[in-house]
Swiss-Prot record:
Cytoplasm among keywords: yes
Naturally occurring in which organism (per UniProt): Clostridium perfringens (strain 13 / Type A)
Keyword terms of this UniProt record: Arginine metabolism, Cytoplasm, Hydrolase
Chief place where the protein resides: cytoplasm
Gene that this sequence comes from: arcA
HAMAP family: Arg_deiminase
Taxonomic path: Bacteria, Bacillati, Bacillota, Clostridia, Eubacteriales
Protein name: Arginine deiminase
InterPro entries: Arg_deiminase
Length: 413
């Protein structure tokens, strides 16, 4: 790894050096039962405890020598580079919030510019803006009066603490993702401004393997780096096959790339199998946690450069078990550790609470949720070192330690 790289991730298990998190904010307290479906939540976490749990997560990372960065802080610092950038950010944020009324747009621009501190402004954008907070706004237009019942001008963004999905670090570049739903696609604006304008990343020659303006969807939970040569991507409830092809073309044909193969895993389209990383994560060189429902046989498509057609892909279908596919492409024996030990009831319960969603901070060393005690005991018996974090409230969002983190730098294996 070059020391001047702003980003470097070539595996799932290389020692973690720098990670991006988002500490849950007031957006959680703007959730109501009526908004759960709209905002893609199943329950309402208790913010005070969720923050305590998240702080324990961050402290665990720091104690392991990991530099912890926060999305909200980097976003605020990125727009401090110039007033032009800040105004562009505000305008784009309002447009993507779906604000139709011109009078309302003007009121929001004035409101956001009233914050003397950019961090406070970003926090408010993430939390959501209620109509009653715009003190000088009067509901005079037909649009505003007809839409008077809904309380928010800008919806809260409660999924932000799952920083894995809006973008993903691959090699020394990123996929700036187009999320499946409008609710979550708004989240990617923060990464856009961070990687284009923050002093830490600006001018660092960071390639974008995928862009948020693409029309098909791609989410970071479906992107797993199996080695410096092999990227796995799930074709799932949230990621389209067309997106996998776009990503593969850019990644495999980039002049400085180490990647040679993209493996597209077709997984069941359901809430429990939302992303590839909800059913399958790497914990050591040869060990993976899996949901029993993903062991296969699976449909997997190997995408490689077409030697006879420059710029095109060769797509090879393989139908085999997960173990055999991993063994073939990683060239080693593989141990699959089943969530819940394979017990049907325990596996379903612990899978619902992300028992298969671990974050490796080094080979054979992972962070896990305390509530998945059966899976955790099995991992320990397999020689995996565990860092167990509290999870009663964080887990209500249906994401585990991997979902809540975006590695920016890992040591190469």
């Amino acid at each position: 790894m070059r020391d001047d790289r702003a980003l470097n991730v070539t595996s799932e298990i290389g020692r973690l050096k720098t990670v991006l998190l988002h500490r849950p904010g007031e957006e959680i307290e703007n959730l109501t039962p009526d908004l759960l479906d709209r905002l893609l939540f199943d329950d309402i976490p208790y913010l005070k405890v969720a923050r305590e749990e998240h702080d324990a997560f961050a402290q665990t990372l720091r104690e392991a020598g990991v530099e912890v960065l926060y999305l909200e802080v980097l976003a605020a610092e990125a727009i401090e580079t110039s007033d032009e950038v800040k105004q562009q950010f505000i305008s784009e944020f309002i447009d993507e919030a779906g604000v139709e009324s011109e009078r309302l747009k003007e009121a929001l621009i004035e409101y956001f510019n009233s914050f003397s501190d950019n961090k406070a402004m970003v926090d408010k954008m993430m939390a959501g803006v209620r109509k009653e907070e715009l003190k000088d706004y009067h509901r005079e237009s037909l649009y505003d009066q007809v839409n008077n019942v809904y309380p928010f001008v800008c919806d809260p963004m409660p999924n932000l603490y799952f920083t894995r999905d809006p973008f993903a670090t691959i090699g020394h570049g990123i996929t700036l993702n187009h999320m499946r739903t409008d609710t979550r696609n708004r989240e990617t604006i923060f990464a856009k401004y961070i990687f284009r304008h923050h002093p830490r990343f600006e001018g660092k020659d960071i390639p974008f393997w995928f862009n948020r303006n693409d029309k098909t969807s791609l989410e970071g939970g479906d992107e797993l780096i199996l080695s410096k040569e092999i990227l796995a991507v799930g074709i799932s409830q949230r990621t389209d096959s067309a997106s996998v092809e776009k990503l593969a073309k850019k990644l495999l044909y980039y002049p400085d790339t180490s990647f040679k193969t993209v493996l597209a895993f077709k997984i069941p389209v359901s809430r429990a199998f939302m992303h590839l990383d909800t059913v399958f994560t790497q914990v050591d060189y040869d060990k993976f946690t899996v949901h029993p429902g993903i062991v296969g046989p699976l449909e997997v498509y190997a995408l490689t450069k077409d030697p006879e057609n420059d710029g095109q892909l060769l797509v090879t279908e393989e139908v085999d078990t997960l173990e055999n596919i991993l063994k073939k492409y990683l060239d080693r024996d593989i141990k699959l550790i089943k969530c819940g030990g394979g017990d049907e009831i325990i596996a379903a319960r612990e899978q619902w609470n992300d028992g298969s969603n671990t974050l490796a901070i080094a080979p054979g060393e992972v962070i896990v949720y305390s509530r998945n005690y059966v899976t955790n005991e099995i991992l320990e018996k397999e020689g995996i070192k565990l860092h167990v974090i509290p999870s009663s409230e964080l887990s209500r969002g249906r994401g585990g330690p991997r979902c809540m983190s975006m590695p920016l730098i890992r040591e190469d294996l």
